[in-house]
Swiss-Prot record:
Residues with N6-lipoyllysine modification: 65
GO CC annotation terms, alphabetical: cytosol; glycine cleavage complex
Keyword list, A-Z: Lipoyl
Task performed by this protein: The glycine cleavage system catalyzes the degradation of glycine. The H protein shuttles the methylamine group of glycine from the P protein to the T protein.
Pfam families in the cross-refs: GCV_H
Known partners and oligomeric status: The glycine cleavage system is composed of four proteins: P, T, L and H.
Cofactor note text: Binds 1 lipoyl cofactor covalently.
Residue ranges of every copy of the Lipoyl-binding domain listed in the record: 24-105
Assigned protein family: Belongs to the GcvH family.
Cofactor: (R)-lipoate
Provenance organism: Burkholderia multivorans (strain ATCC 17616 / 249)
BP term (GO), one: glycine decarboxylation via glycine cleavage system
Classification lineage: Bacteria, Pseudomonadati, Pseudomonadota, Betaproteobacteria, Burkholderiales
Name of the featured protein: Glycine cleavage system H protein
Amino acid sequence: MSNVPADLKYTEEHEWIRTEADGTLTVGITDHAQSTLGDIVFLELPEVGKQVTAGDAVGVVESVKAASDIYSPVSGEIVEINSAIVDTPDSVNSDAYASWLFKIKLADGASTDKLIDAAAYGKLID
């Protein structure tokens, strides 16, 4: 069974989301996603300042097995990317939940209602 921290929210597309004290959301891919993909060799992340809509493809994760889109879990503005992880994409394999990809500020009126909790995500990947 994959590691599914209870304090995070998730998407059905295998992204994890942590709400920060300032209200921004930190986004990464789940342990299940990295395990399924295998050794990650390349990450393409969104540009800071980009306005995105929930469900938009905002980046790409490439492994030795496959390439997969990274989706925005909510509508908002990309406010930061983890540029260090672009240089060491394999760190996602080592610790998916410490290896965040980008931070997003919710758009006015946007919500996190469609995100799922750890229990629901655990059932999804069982």
